[in-house]
Amino acid sequence: MTAQLIDGNALSRQLRTEVAQRAALLRARGITPGLAVVLVGDNPASQVYVRNKVKACEDNGLHSVLERYPAEMSEADLLARVEALNNDPAIHGILVQLPLPAHIDAQKVIEAISPAKDVDGFHVGSAGALMVGQPGFWPCTPYGCMKMLESIGYDLRGKHAVVIGRSNIVGKPMALMLLQKNATVTICHSATADLKAMTLQADVIVAAVGKRNVLRADMVKPGAVVIDVGMNRNEEGKLCGDVDFDGVKEVAGYITPVPGGVGPMTITMLLVNTLEAAERG
């Protein structure tokens, strides 16, 4: 068996077409959805991510503002900028690119963002809304994973889903989203005694730890759906995920590639969240 690919690029194009159409309807009413992206410092990876987010906005009818600041920027000054953006009616979503310089408390900055503009879904208010099933902004990466499962018509009810990783950005919210769809969810992490025993029971596996080959073919039951959130580089410098793709694709029923899987979906769901923030207005 060779797994079917869940193509994140193709799904992203489809969803971005819908975003552009909805953005055009808003613009016809005099509302241009606006995203502010704040970058502190000169982390090369962050600069690439930020450029991609700004370009995605421009390509799909959203207004974007990129604010760049030196790594020496004080926490107080950054908090003041966030507050100014909170009060700017032309801005519907605010994204502060992580990681921040060590002298700035990232969680404090995240909490300073108005929950109504928290399109990254990292605010405790957004996390709480997800926990109790209330409307709010879902973190973009797990939200994208859910859209990928939806795209293949996968019914999670009664299925066993294993999430490898427990970060606030992916692992924990991913587990809650799967739970909302009536999956039975197991979260695995660095202290899990026997990861293979857990994953072999799984109908769905989401790998999100940032470690190459954390999931191998002998750890996957035939026909399972494998979502690879990881973004790593191999010895040749090529992008790869957390999953041993070549091995696992011979066992799984569905699998996401890296690159071209979850990555483009993350930015697409940021656009969706920003659009929804503007629609809620």
Swiss-Prot record:
Pathway: One-carbon metabolism; tetrahydrofolate interconversion. Catalyzes the oxidation of 5,10-methylenetetrahydrofolate to 5,10-methenyltetrahydrofolate and then the hydrolysis of 5,10-methenyltetrahydrofolate to 10-formyltetrahydrofolate. The lineage of its organism: Bacteria, Pseudomonadati, Pseudomonadota, Betaproteobacteria, Burkholderiales. One of its GO terms (biological process) is tetrahydrofolate interconversion. The gene is folD. Keywords: Amino-acid biosynthesis, Histidine biosynthesis, Hydrolase, Methionine biosynthesis, Multifunctional enzyme, NADP, One-carbon metabolism, Oxidoreductase, Purine biosynthesis. It comes from Polaromonas naphthalenivorans (strain CJ2). GO terms for molecular function: methenyltetrahydrofolate cyclohydrolase activity; methylenetetrahydrofolate dehydrogenase (NADP+) activity. The keyword Secreted does not apply. It catalyses: (6R)-5,10-methylene-5,6,7,8-tetrahydrofolate + NADP(+) = (6R)-5,10-methenyltetrahydrofolate + NADPH; (6R)-5,10-methenyltetrahydrofolate + H2O = (6R)-10-formyltetrahydrofolate + H(+). Belongs to the tetrahydrofolate dehydrogenase/cyclohydrolase family. The keyword Lipid metabolism does not apply. Homodimer. CDD domains: NAD_bind_m-THF_DH_Cyclohyd. PROSITE patterns: THF_DHG_CYH_1 (PS00766), THF_DHG_CYH_2 (PS00767). Its EC number is 1.5.1.5, 3.5.4.9. Coiled coil: none annotated. NADP(+) binds at residues 165-167, 190. GO terms for cellular component: cytosol. This is Bifunctional protein FolD.
